[in-house]
Amino acid sequence: MKLFDNLQKKIDKKKSIQKHYISKEQIKQTAKENSRIIKELEKQNNRKNVPEEEYLTKMRDSNNVVEFDDLHAYFFTDAGIVKAVDGVSFDIPKKSIVGVVGESGCGKSVTSLALMKLMQKPQGQIFSGEIRYNAKDGKAYNISKVPREDMNKIRGKEMSMIFQEPMTSLNPVFRIGDQLDEILFLHFPGITPEEAKEKSITMLKTVGMAMPESVYSRYPHELSGGMRQRVMIAMALSCDPNLIIADEPTTALDVTIQAQILDLLRSIKNDINGSIMLITHDLGVIAEMADYVVVMYAGRIIEKGTAREIYKNPQHPYTVGLQKSIPALNLNDEKLYTIPGTVPNPINMPNYCYFRDRCNKRFGKCDGEYPATIQISPTHSVACYLAEEIAAELAKSKDGEKNAKK
């Protein structure tokens, strides 16, 4: 019996390998088709002297600074199309912090790179959907249609990004001052070197940098991790942006410096009267900082709502699993909780719920098509059959109570 089981396992493994095997001919065909798509998309991006009317749009709600509407951002590889962001829709209201959370590879960073139009070219492309941006001048831009030369005027001035690795984001051969001044020269052509230096030193003071004049003259390798991150924040603030995207801003920093950076971001949001899109896998950071939370899994949003709704009343089993994974001080010698299984192959995603094979709440309905998004409250939504069943039961019981009163 044991011999038969081992043989069956080998057969199943072989079938699995054959199922995902891609022949040279298939790779060649895929590469050819992807090359055609990339060429067409790049042609659109590289157009010059495009009339503004082509990428002007209207905000669905004027109180939002950004609206992601059915965004699809793909990577066209020889092995196939990686759907890194697959139909993402959410808003970033003015004067708020929206936290985007999920494990590595869920698409949260690609979402932000699509907003900044910094996806790795030529493979990385915004394939479809809209990203509506509410500019400081009152105009609304569809970022997905803004040509490259016009995007250079928006990026850095209207919206800026704090990257997760300051050591690799800063140029090691230029002094800090040169890198800060460069942004000002780009967006304010009439500024003098003396004015740029004064503004850069002021920004270093704003982010709490001790001896800003000294830091201005140093190279990145002469600064600590926390100091480099403060430089990145100063750089992001240089042009008084409407929106700051903070991608894992506390990565590789010790807890004390992490707390300082988070406090700094919170105070900056109030000072500039702007919004922050905070990307992290750390639910503790999200709980402390965010007004609204978007939970992503395998390129899609599985749950979103206010921070209170997500933490007090999580509806999706993945969100529950993420919360259970947070280490607690009272665990004693218990094992830390982990979500079993792995994320599906991004090139060959299933047509059912992406979390199904890892879910401990799975039932018959989960074998059907990908679940639709349902509203739990005006601000809380989830894509899950279990939540759908619970909502239906609650609605039925409420109807029963009403009929009983009659």
Model-derived features: positions:
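A short, proline-enriched helix->beta-strand linker immediately N-terminal to the Walker B motif
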Residues: 238-242
